[in-house]
A protein has these predicted regions:
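Phosphate-binding/catalytic loop of phosphoryl-transfer enzymes
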Residues: 1-58, 176-181
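ATP-binding/phosphotransfer module of carbohydrate and carboxylate kinases, centering on a glycine-rich
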Residues: 1-6, 48, 59-181
């Protein structure tokens, strides 16, 4: 089931409370003992972006809900939650829309980096905040195109609606595969 069926390789990037990344090749997820350290979160996506709690400037951690809420709060001049940002973005409020576009360009930069290095057949964008990518898909494409060679194949990507049931099915499928083969 799902968008990865029939593909030789695919990557999944998640945005929300954190930033996640996984790669599947020949139907098998790439396993590594370092996978739980959130390594993709410290990939540079905007040299002028905000600092993360580790002190990195412009790393992919700026795609997390907390970082977006902080950046939005600075833009509007008072504290705001991520949910307030999301409501303003969905209502096309100017400052929220500007941050959506900036965030999507940054996400596109991350997608291009993954496409350039891992060369998956497709990249899925998922997570509880993936709706942001749908609001700024033009800037997402601009971010990809900025860092993707013009003669390389276009990056095939899909923005998934967040669905906890799909996460559960994916986990169940992995467990079943281990026992059934």
């Amino acid at each position: 089931f799902g968008s990865g069926v029939g593909l030789n390789s695919f990557a999944v990037v998640t945005i929300g409370i954190g930033v996640g990344y996984s790669l599947t090749v020949n139907g098998e997820p790439i396993e590594n003992p370092d996978k739980s350290y959130g390594l993709v979160g410290h990939t540079l996506v905007d040299p002028d972006g905000p600092r993360c709690i580790s002190g990195h400037k412009g790393c992919a951690t700026c795609l997390t809900d907390n970082s977006i809420a902080t950046e939005y709060s600075e833009m509007i001049g008072h504290p705001a939650t991520f949910d307030e940002f999301a409501a303003a973005a969905r209502a096309s409020k100017t400052q929220a829309t500007n941050l959506v576009n900036r965030t999507c360009f940054r996400l596109g930069t991350l997608i291009a980096t993954i496409a350039n290095l891992a060369m998956p057949d497709k990249i899925m964008i998922a997570g509880e905040s993936s709706f942001i990518a749908k609001l700024g898909v033009g800037d997402l494409r601009n971010g990809i195109n900025m860092y993707r060679h013009s003669q390389a194949a276009p990056v095939d990507f899909e923005i998934a609606d967040h669905d906890w049931a799909m996460w559960g099915k994916a986990a169940a499928a992995q467990a079943i595969r281990q026992y059934v083969g």
